[in-house]
Amino acid sequence: MADEHTETRSGPTHSGFVALIGAPNAGKSTLVNQLVGAKVSIVTHKVQTTRAIVRGIATHKNAQIVFVDTPGIFKPRRRLDTAMVTTAWGGAKDADMVLVLIDAQRGLKGDAAEILERLADIRQPKALLLNKVDRVKPEKLLELTQAANARVDFARTFMVSALTGSGCKDLLDYLAETLPEGPWYYPEDQISDLPMRQLAAEITREKLYLRLHQELPYSSHVETEKWEEKQNGSVRIEQVIYVERDSQKKIVLGHKGETIRAIGQASRADIAGILEQKVHLFLFVKVRENWGNDPERYREMGLEFPR
């Protein structure tokens, strides 16, 4: 989709940061990838996949739009949850504009309702995005639009499908016209501010989430420990998957190493596609007890350690 988002520029340039907030699994990361036209944020069927702020950069008309994909907002149960939710609201308050993404199928229940209540603290201009509109009847969409706008003063409402891209061009047009005039923050061909080492670790974490079930993925953390550019043009990458207990390590490895092998193959293919280079990926699993309470791990993830 990247080519569809780039148009001939004339006149002054515009730029700004646009935060995307919403409940877990509302489709924020999928939408950011769609708007940017490339994979900059990992996506799984599990809630709370995004842990830290990821910035995806879209160039549209004469504007550079920096999308801030924030963790899903929900009632925290653990220290890591608290850090993620704090980061999400912080990302909204630091942005030039806030996009509030609501899953139209779920409506204004639970986490979505609480998010709307807290938006009174956000002074930035806000736009409402109803996602998955292709799965909801028009009458219900109208009801949702009226109900949400009755609670929050939204500047605009957009009907989108993060999966198909429907409605995305209208949203990009609006943002390009609305963001303030100013120079671009990043080179024109840059699509993310996430270092490649970190993005590679995120991709492996995505495959871990897709492969494993229940609570185990939430007890894991991936770090890229070595990155070596070879003379033949390939890349050697070594990553460590940290878990909290020996029993979890056995699950990640799988019977005769089948699980970690499958995770590695899937991750290698994605990383190679992004780098457009041959990738040699080596995964290791180590136990780091109680890593979820280690301030250093939070810093590595770009999160503030909750005291």
Predicted regions and their residues:
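Catalytic P-loop NTPase motifs of RecA-like helicase/translocase cores
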Residues: 50, 74-75, 107-108, 136-137, ...
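Conserved G1/Walker A P-loop phosphate-binding module
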Residues: 2-93
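Canonical P-loop GTPase G-domain recognition
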Residues: 125, 134-192
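Conserved glycine(s) of the Walker
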Residues: 27, 167, 259
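P-loop NTP-binding site
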Residues: 196-307
